[in-house]
From Swiss-Prot:
The keyword Electron transport applies. One of its GO terms (molecular function) is ubiquinol-cytochrome-c reductase activity. It holds the Pfam family Cytochrom_B_C. The keyword Chaperone does not apply. Component of the ubiquinol-cytochrome c reductase complex (complex III or cytochrome b-c1 complex) that is part of the mitochondrial respiratory chain. The b-c1 complex mediates electron transfer from ubiquinol to cytochrome c. Contributes to the generation of a proton gradient across the mitochondrial membrane that is then used for ATP synthesis. PROSITE patterns: CYTB_CTER, CYTB_NTER. The chain crosses the membrane at residues 33-53, 77-98, 113-133, 178-198, 226-246, 288-308, 320-340, 347-367. This is Cytochrome b. The gene is MT-CYB. Belongs to the cytochrome b family.
Amino acid sequence: MTILRKTHPLAKIIYNSFIDLPAPSNISAWWNFGSLLGICLILQILTGLFLAMHYTSDTATAFSSVTHICRDVNYGWIIRYMHANGASMFFICLFLHVGRGLYYGSYMYPETWNIGIILLFAVMATAFMGYVLPWGQMSFWGATVITNLLSAIPYIGNSLVEWIWGGFSVDKATLTRFFAFHFILPFIISALAAVHLLFLHETGSNNPSGIPSDSDKIPFHPYYTIKDILGALFLILVLMVLVLFSPDLLGDPDNYIPANPLNTPPHIKPEWYFLFAYAILRSIPNKLGGVLALVFSILVLAIIPLLHTSKQRGMMFRPLSQCLFWLLVADLLVLTWIGGQPVEHPFITIGQLASILYFAILLIFMPIISIIENNLLKW
């Protein structure tokens, strides 16, 4: 067996990635989210596959096909709600995973970090298109509003929007192509995740102290396999509590109303995991400016490695940076809250201030505080 696992081309890759991988001895539970994201992805692909067996991507029947899944298909309701709430769990793990990377300086592995940003965009695109498929009110109007943002692109904007729609409005062609893309993207995400892992295993994992751990490595199995299984059990517990007790907690009631192009919902808003970006988009009165801010709110992560001015890698021993990091987390929570509120007096100003603070922390305060901490080390 030992000979086979070290010689067989396929077994060698699997064993070197999940069994014999040298891992730092001090990585905390914050390093569990990579495996949890893998589990979420597998879960989403499997539940999605079973949903696709019964779903019809036609404007006339899409809404009723989802109803049919919930009412008539054996355990269809649990598959549907596991898929919908699985997306929420996916994003919770994603945000915590990115937050861990920011806190502990994992962005100092630029290849892994940049593939991660591409993965984030791909998952966001997949989730957006998936939200359109049930063809409820929020599906239709969400698709209309978000795709319409592309019309802000100079010269080609309007043509681009009509090209994406496949007509002059969000209609049958749009739904069909969104279903096709929603089906294929998770497999592209799987391939990207494999590349993400490939780059990570070139350098080895970071650890909480930020100090190279080459002299102190332990095998991944059994130490971290058992740790990952514990994390997975906790993830499944939370997901199943959500699915079985309050499956609609994170959804929008408007999506139980079939799509009607003649009736606009009072408040158009995306799923909760996009609200922070939606708040940044709305905080800028100009359409093109808003779209740029929306894209840059995620793309800003790509320039974080260039703005690293500290002599230490992580924030474990940098209390000033820690304060700033948690201020950023609080700011993102405020943005998420604002994204779900109507566009009226106090919320507009709060949203604009929170958006300015978001970019200011990442682009201005973090590098400056790091320089101050470097100077404090000299005393």
